[in-house]
Amino acid sequence: MRKEIVEKMEQLIIPPASYTILGIPLIILYIIIPIIGVALFTFIIAQRLHPLIKAAPDNRLDQFGLRVFNMLKYAVGQYKQPRYMLAGVLHIVIFAGFCILSLRSLTLVIAGIKSGYTLPLFDTWIGTIYNVLKDIAATAVLIAVVVAAIRRGVYKPERYKVPEKLGKDHTAEAIFVLAMIGGLMVADMFFEGSDLAAHMNKGIETHYFLFPLTGTWFVTYFLTFCSEATLQFCHVFFYTVHEVIFFSFLNFLPLGKHFHVITSMFNVFFMKLNKGSVKPVKWGVSDEQLDDLESFGVKNFEDFTWKHILDFYSCADCGRCADQCPANHVGRPLAPRFITIKCRDFCFDKYPLKEESIDKGPLIGSILEEDEIWSCTTCGACEEECPLLIEYIDKIVDLRRGMVDEGMVPQSLQKPLNALGKRGNPYGKTEKKRGEWTKPLLKDEGYECKILSGKKAETAEILFFADSITSYDDRIQEIGQSSFRILKACGVDFGILGPAEKDSGHEVRRFGEEMLFQDLKEKNTQAILDSGVKKIITADPHALNALKKDYDNLPPVEHVSEFLFRMIQEGKIKFKPLENQGDVYVYHDPCYLGRHNLIYDAPRVVLDAIPGLNRVEMERSRDRSFCCGGGGLMLFYEPIEETRMGKERVQMASEAGATVIVTACPFCMVNIEDGIKTSGNEGKIRAIDLVELVDQQIIK
């Protein structure tokens, strides 16, 4: 019986592969279109692979299982899309529909060559279920592309806009691609609907389950008013339209920002796995071999690694990175997406599909600007937001390495860098004074600090690594002293390196001075290993990140907030109630504690353990925290900006109703206290470090 129905179906509507016009079989056209489409696509992809092959090496094949998991989570699962809810939902609908309907499109391509072709088992109940899913998906995708096109073309959210000097606007391209996707949906609905309408007009039952209220359902009932000849025309015409759009779409993708449709899976698979770290100067070159390199960093396009060029290909130009970038927010000449857009345009110009290569010279000065690259605080907000895990910090650090190698260092950074080379700290103060922040503790409280270096070196289980700002800045020394008291109260056997300690070099490396960083790292590593400590604690997230991510073979490193969290969990410390319980506290997540090291809960648990403390959250908190302005060398840099990040952050705290801003980073303290002054909030809002608050409230 089923065979008879199929035969009757074939008699009603002639399938495209069997149709002729003026005696010419259309199957010839349906063979030519895929051949040309696939050949052209292969040529374009080969050209796009050329820059990747010429690029610098990059090691991205480790931890295969984790990479597969990340690909399933971020690329297939669209994990980060809902962070921008409307755009995210629209993208998820289109992506899910794309996954379901790609199988349909491939089947149709084959059906144009082999009449009546269906996939194995698709003539059973499996095919019925798939057809229902296909019709629902096509309807949802069509609605989504219409909404997305109106949103992109009419409402034009601010984050999509592109200043003319920074690259071309992609609105027209986005709407064109949405139109092609919508065209594929409509073509398939009319192709399927014309066949179903023909059978309905003849009263012949089909095996196709027409799901109510889908696009195919509406089209089918609309077409029942048409003649058999019209239905035949629709069947062949819309099949041809589908073929042309499908292969045009395929070949258009690698020509612009929609290349991410093809590259995103690969880009996420090869994502950076070690957050907070910085790539080596060159893969395959050890630290000991750096002296042999003729050039450092990125100066020309081919100096980028192949993964970073893949990043350029994969950017969807959604603007999320720039929308979250604090440098962009305060008017600095930096928006991460424009680095990608300009470099991708440069790549397409330098490696065109057919003309000769267009070489525009070095990147800095011709494509990218010095101030643009120095404006970045390496806070990681852009990378945290990107749904395709595009990396910016490593590119910026490599560009800075190239500029430093060419002597292109901002005037405001030259003095602190020279001081770091001579004295091991950016303030130019002597090494002998590095441990003097502990003297008031001995004088006023009788606490003597162990010095774990020098001829009279003592021994201890734990090293408290102060770093430069805690050692030399009068205000921040109070944070070190509070940390000292807390460790003493907890009965910890600890000490400091004193004169043997050098700056951790965290910002030195991220500002491109690799050889200076290596020198600081070598001296610190030797001093730490010689001390014989089994663990390191620091109150500085930048030092934490450097010692954990940039150094090798050190004892375990812990931020003081993690230590306090553990002490609370073990019941080893208790707090007395706050005296002034009318204050409203808010916690500011330091970038290098939160985004780069994923320490969000420990400081909050500590705060919530203090009786009577009323805590609120800022809108931009945790992994969306707003950078205070940057630490280390960024304190010395004089950027072009309309306002200060610290001032903006204080305003956010004020809007949350806070009267006390708590942070867990000495650099955040400097910037936030400055922000309180410049925003006119003195007397209304105050700032305190987590360890200072704990020092006040701990029962000793």
Name each region found by the language model:
Residues 183, 219-229, 280-281, 285-288, ...:
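Iron-sulfur cluster-binding electron-transfer modules in prokaryotic oxidoreductases
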Residues 92-104, 175-202:
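Hydrophobic alpha-helical membrane-insertion segments
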Residues 2-18, 111-129, 193-234:
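Membrane-interfacial helical/loop segments at transmembrane boundaries in membrane proteins
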Residues 5-154, 303-312, 334-338, 347-555, ...:
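Iron-sulfur-cluster electron-transfer modules
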Residues 60-61, 65, 83-88, 122-133, ...:
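Membrane-interface segments at loop-to-transmembrane junctions
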Residues 41-59, 110-114, 147-162, 189-205, ...:
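Juxtamembrane/interface segments at transmembrane-helix termini
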Residues 234-236, 250-376, 423:
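Ferredoxin-type iron-sulfur electron-transfer modules and their immediate structural context
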Residues 33-40, 141-145, 232-269:
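Alpha-helical membrane-embedded segments
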